[in-house]
Amino acid sequence: SLTGIYNRYGFDELAEQMITKNPEAKFVAVLLDIDDFKFVNDIYGHVYGDNALKSLADSMKAFFPSGALLGRNGGDEFVILLKDYSYDDVKEKLQQFTMAPKTFSYKGKEHQFSISLGYAEYPTFASNRSQLMRCADAALYEIKLHGKNGCMAYKEGLELRARKQLGFAFKDISENLPGAFIIYRADKEDDELFYANQEFLHMTGYKDMDELF
């Protein structure tokens, strides 16, 4: 593979096994991506975008312990699962990794890039892998809203806040679309609703979105 680490499907399968086989263990899931990766591709080209992805994957392999499960979800998003770690164990390390200089090569020169990172703890905030990743994703989304190039631990309420932000975005996008519809994430373990337009609420007899949750 391009990065030499697990793809999304391989990572998800192994992460599921690790958590299922060790229900009493603590885990920390980490989601991270390259800030403004689209601009890296647009300015330097996809070959050099790939160099940035490889560079980040190599940094992850060198920095995190050998027992860490490393994967790439696709695009510029990467994921890590750390077994027998808690927030207190990882806070300083993840901050250090986020702030460490990261570069890729372009025409013989090194160019810097930054990352954003969100993480969540199992079983404190989640009862399964899917929920754990969703919490880490909410923390990553929050750091993106606050200027990128940083890391954040998940805390109660972040997921709802992220969902509301997405709801506002979907409302703007769908304002002129005809018909009744909802937007949700289909998940075999835990479906998640993002948005329902007024036509759908009227058709189903609900007053507002809150009644659907």
Predicted regions and their residues:
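Conserved nucleotide-binding and Mg2+-coordinating catalytic segments in signaling enzymes
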Residues: 1-13, 32-46, 54
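Short regulatory alpha-helical coupling segments
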Residues: 8-26, 57-65, 165-168
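Catalytic-core segments of nucleotide cyclases and related cyclic-nucleotide turnover enzymes
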Residues: 46, 91, 122-148
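A short pre-motif secondary-structure segment
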Residues: 68-72
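Catalytic strand-loop-helix junctions within cyclic-nucleotide turnover domains
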Residues: 81-90, 107-110, 115-132, 158, ...
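Flexible, glycine/charge-rich interdomain/linker segments that couple
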Residues: 123, 142-165
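PAS/PAS-like sensory domain cap-loop motif
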Residues: 200-212
